[in-house]
Amino acid sequence: MNYGTCNRNLRKANSNILPANTIVLDLTQDESAILNRMKPKTRYNIRLALRKGVNVVSVGMEGLETWYELYTETALRNGLHLNDISYFRNMFASKTECPDNGVNVKLMIAYYDKIPLAAMFLVLSAHRATYLYGASTSKMRN
């Protein structure tokens, strides 16, 4: 969406650096209500991952190298802009430098048998959680 750009001589960039779309999900509902609003294939894939033993873990800076390997693979696979690892290191640093600002940055990694499959940066504030960056491996996609 390019709201108000015609009068300001602004143009959309050739590629998106941050998410181009936003979905608002009400997390005050119970799990079954949230799942029922999803497409059947999405529900199936979530339940399949649970049955197969995929675990999602919140990690700190120690997970950054794993994140970056998945992120690099994702960016190369999809032709996305690739930030340097220092960009993501600074995201964590800003969280720790300002612990009272009400914002929390979490790095979540999904593992199967200690093998990292996917990862995401989740930014939490008082009333919102934003899935900011995601990454996944090309292997074990079933």
Set out the residue ranges of the language-model regions.
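A conserved beta-strand-loop-helix scaffold within acyl/acetyltransferase catalytic domains
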Residues: 2-141
